[in-house]
């Protein structure tokens, strides 16, 4: 989403990322961006509702499923909807979309957004280091460190992000978890039990 926001900034279009910061898996990246002075890039979904109109475009990134969007209220209130995703299409897709960029052969949504960035604006407008590392982390996560679902385009996107300043060492730090998080996850896994058709009961 931060890559799409950078495209909006390059095009001088006001934009924000609607995200519940207390429930996102991208907390480390968001914290790094906030520390770099980009706190205004983010807004709570409920806080976004008053600024939405029929002229507002909602860009959904990395999912096509209605049940996985950050806020259905935002989706329903926006006048236009665009979807950027790489997952193979199944049930529950967003029917309201006015524009769909669906590329199942891409390794990740980050790869697609990185390709878009190479065709927008001048070199000086490109993502900063933290934004580039966020995109690279998306590629590394979805490809399991470039071992699955990679192609020429994947490595070209990664090379572009390296040119923008992304460092793999910094990217790996985004995946680091605290000891509290690690022990909590380990406890959840160890206490999980099989229940009715392989559903997990804790």
Task: Identify what each model region corresponds to.
Residues 1-13, 88-199:
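A structured phosphate/pyrophosphate-recognition subdomain
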Residues 1-52:
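Anionic-ligand anchoring segments at beta-strand to alpha-helix junctions in alpha/beta enzyme folds, i.e.
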Residues 202:
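Calmodulin-binding IQ motif helices
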């Amino acid at each position: 989403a931060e890559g799409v926001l950078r495209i909006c900034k390059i095009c001088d279009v006001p934009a924000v990322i609607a995200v519940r910061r207390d429930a996102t898996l991208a907390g480390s990246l968001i914290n790094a961006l906030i520390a770099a002075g980009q706190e205004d890039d983010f807004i709570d979904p409920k806080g976004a509702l008053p600024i939405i109109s029929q002229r507002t475009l909602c860009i959904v990134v990395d999912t096509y499923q209605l049940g996985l969007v950050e806020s259905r209220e935002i989706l329903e209130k926006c006048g236009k909807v665009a979807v950027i995703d790489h997952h193979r299409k199944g049930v529950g897709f967003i029917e309201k979309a006015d524009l769909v960029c669906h590329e199942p052969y891409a390794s990740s949504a980050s790869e697609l957004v990185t390709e878009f960035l190479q065709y927008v604006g001048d070199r000086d407008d490109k993502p900063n280091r933290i934004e580039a590392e966020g995109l690279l982390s998306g590629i590394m996560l979805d490809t399991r460190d470039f071992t699955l679902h990679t192609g020429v385009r994947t490595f070209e996107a990664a090379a572009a992000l390296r040119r923008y300043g992304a460092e793999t060492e910094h990217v790996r730090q985004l995946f680091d978890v605290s000891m509290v998080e690690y022990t909590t996850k380990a406890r959840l896994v160890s206490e999980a039990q099989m229940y009715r058709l392989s559903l997990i009961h804790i």
